[in-house]
Amino acid sequence: MKEFQVYLELDRSLQHDFLYPLIFREYIYALAYDHGLNNSILVENLGYDNKSSLLIVKRLITRMYQQKHLILSANDSNKNQFWGYNKNLYSQIISEGFAVSVEIPFSLQLISSLEEAEIVKSYNLRSIHSIFPFFEEKFPYLNYVSDVRIPYPIHLEILVQTLRYWVKDASSFHLLRLFLYEYCNWNSLITPKKWISTFSKSNPRLFLFLYNFYVCEYESILIFLRNKSSYLRLTSSGVLFERIYFYAKIEHRVEVFDKDFPSTLWFFKDPFIHYVRYQGKSILSSKNTPFFMNKWKYYLIHLWQCHFYVWSQPGKIHINQLSEHSFYFLGYFSNVRLNPSVVRSQMLENSFIIENVMKKLDTIIPIIPLIRSLAKAKFCNVLGHPISKPVWADSSDFYIIDRFLRICRNLSHYYNGSSNKKSLYRIKYILRLSCIKTLARKHKSTVRVFLKRLGSKFLEEFFTEEEEILSLILPRASFTLQRLYRGRIWYLDIFYFHQ
């Protein structure tokens, strides 16, 4: 992105924040396809789902200068060829270039805010595991929690009208309406889920931009309501715009993204309410009374209905006590557990027994959803009994073992923060036995004969613990350090969670 910064600044200064002329720039399409100006991707004439070469882009720009090719109508057909390609291909190329250009004002604003705040970029700030230390620090002292699912989709005209406050180019909005008209029925106030699926697959970058902008607008109003509802100003949050190539952290506010599926981790905290969000699910928690939580519940409902014209049922937002309720977030079931302890103190001839109760956040692996996912992937049945993977039986032994080990290590890496590792050991056992059955199926043997031939140490990597790896790296590590790594470990290199 840095190599195109000069071009972006030049166009921005010449066009006075007009984005429409950017679709006539070749480097915009190079950004869209993640390759340089001197490179191209050769494609066959197979339709508009393929990547476009730079030669096609040059032809398209020439045609846009010469005629009104951007005017598409319902009479256009897939059979109408245009220099060997149909018009849907050109529409796809332009929409992806437009998705890049519409991100530029927000990206430039993010860069300037980073420079003003003198924030040092670090990849560790993107980790979604950074939210769990926040949970461990704050949630044991809170009383109530509420799971909130951000309603989506909304009517796309509302999105376009909201964008007009940030981008001054009216031509860009007419072009955006043109692209959206190809995928939905504008006569309906409720966008069907089928249209959302089609739109997200055809142009994921533009879809994610619109969705992230909608969430950003929603959270900006949420912060405004928070400041108006309290005499104490909220100082631990800020408004930044994050796209595919940018991230930032300001005090207690973290934004997280992934190149393939941009998703934002965002939270703020204050003495009254704590807010955490990942993708479309958010958590509201407070130490105050249920009345305070109900007030925020109806704040959100009226905000969605009156500002975004999205209907949300109040019964779907539940308010629960943290001590009696487990909430599901980022692949973990989390709850606050009471940990009683008894301390005996003796002073001269008198002894005292002091009972102390400490609250501790428990993070539990959801074993049933994980087994359901493994059963869907054909690693086991619905009861959790391991089965062979016949699809991989034709591959080499090294490939089969490597695939199983990779899945096992990824799961172990992510769920090493669990309070109880027994569920993780069960998942490892399922994958280990599934791997053995797959190899035995390939060699036309039984599991017992196969293990007897290879020995009992076969596939022991499945049960390799993190402290064993650390002992190889740090052979002189103390016993205290080894005990430390038997506990919960949160990693700062996990950038997204695939559900």
Swiss-Prot record:
| Localisation per UniProt entry | Plastid, Chloroplast
Q: Which InterPro entries match?
A: Domain_X, Maturase_MatK, Maturase_MatK_N
- Which cysteine pairs make disulfide bonds? none
- Alphabetically list the UniProt keywords: Chloroplast, mRNA processing, Plastid, RNA-binding, tRNA processing
Coarsely, its chief localization is plastid
Keyword Plastid annotated: yes
Query: Which biological process terms from the Gene Ontology are attached to this UniProt entry?
Result: mRNA processing; RNA splicing; tRNA processing
Q: Does the keyword field hold ATP-binding?
A: no
Which molecular-function annotations from GO does this UniProt entry contain?
A: RNA binding
Report one GO cellular component.
Answer: chloroplast
Which Pfam families does this UniProt record tie to the protein? Intron_maturas2, MatK_N
Role this protein plays: Usually encoded in the trnK tRNA gene intron. Probably assists in splicing its own and other chloroplast group II introns.
Q: Which family does it belong to?
A: Belongs to the intron maturase 2 family. MatK subfamily.
Identification of the protein by name: Maturase K
